[in-house]
Amino acid sequence: MMEKNSKIYVAGHRGMVGSAIVRELKKQGYNNIVVRTHNELDLLCQKDVEGFFSEEKPEYVFLAAAKVGGILANESALADFMYDNIMLEMNVIHSAWKNGCKKLEFLGSSCIYPRLAKQPMKEECLLTGELEKTNEAYALAKISGLKYCEFLNRQYGTDYISVMPTNLYGPNDNYHPMHSHVLPALIRRFHEAKIEGKRSVTCWGDGSPLREFLYVDDLANLCVFLMNHYSGNETVNAGTGKELSIWELTDLVANIVGYHGSIEWDLSKPNGTPRKLLDISKATKLGWVYKTELEDGIRLAYQDFLDNPIRAER
């Protein structure tokens, strides 16, 4: 279990997940948190990462750094998504092991599970079927990271754990029109349509896919909880256990943003995986419960978007 003065490194502290973990750690009284910006430490450079771990010797590591994006970003940069994510994961995990890190927590994604996996998806369904093609590169990279943690545990007795979150949203999200995920993309799209007085907004696909969403501060709470209370080779799913269709989501976001025009659907665009709902029974049996309902979380996320307009340009 982490002490309040344990040296804790959060990789990716400027991203949505990493910044939420830092907030949660500070909220709980941890006072020796180490972070580095990309300019200070390029996680793709093995030499630099090894030098950082050799000098700092963090006792605990939260690996929240990743190259992320929605369907468009993933499909247009398959090689980049695979290379960048595998390299940064391996550099951090391997350097942590070489320098005696007590415990590491790897943040993955629910996209690691098969496209047509039985719902809700249990942790053990990993590698039992074909992946969703629109984010296959990212999924394979994340699978590599969690498997490397598992293999280090099995071969060297390390205590490295993996968490697989569902779709995330909340403060410090990425609202870029080309690189964002569905929920922040909808927030931006409906906000701009409201400001510009557009009569209609067009969304991808037909609205039928079912999705689950978890507020990022709830994930951060789980991450700290697991670092202190869980060890094992099995991954732990992070979600709410609740789902809604993309059609229902667009209607909810439009109402919260205050857009009252019509919503149209571009059937030439891909839907992605038809359904993604995580089985979160493992996390709940450990004693964790999420706190933020979707409508409340979207209101908080929209306010964060309004308070920080520069995020829309990332």
Residue ranges and their predicted role:
Residues 46-86, 95-98:
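NAD(P)H-binding glycine-rich loop region in Rossmannoid oxidoreductase-like domains
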Residues 71, 106-121, 137-143, 155, ...:
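Conserved catalytic-site region of short-chain dehydrogenase/reductase
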Residues 112-114, 137, 161-185, 209-210:
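Flexible, glycine-rich beta-alpha linker
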Residues 4, 90-135:
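Conserved Rossmann-fold NAD(P)-dependent oxidoreductase catalytic core, especially the SDR/UDP-sugar
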Residues 133-166, 185-196:
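Active-site Tyr-X1-5-Lys
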Residues 11-12, 16, 20-24, 28, ...:
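C-terminal substrate-binding subdomain of Rossmann-fold SDR/epimerase-dehydratase oxidoreductases
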Residues 82, 86, 134-146, 176-184, ...:
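Short-chain dehydrogenase/reductase
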Residues 26-51:
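Adenosine-cofactor binding site in Rossmann-like domains, unifying the SAM/SAH pocket
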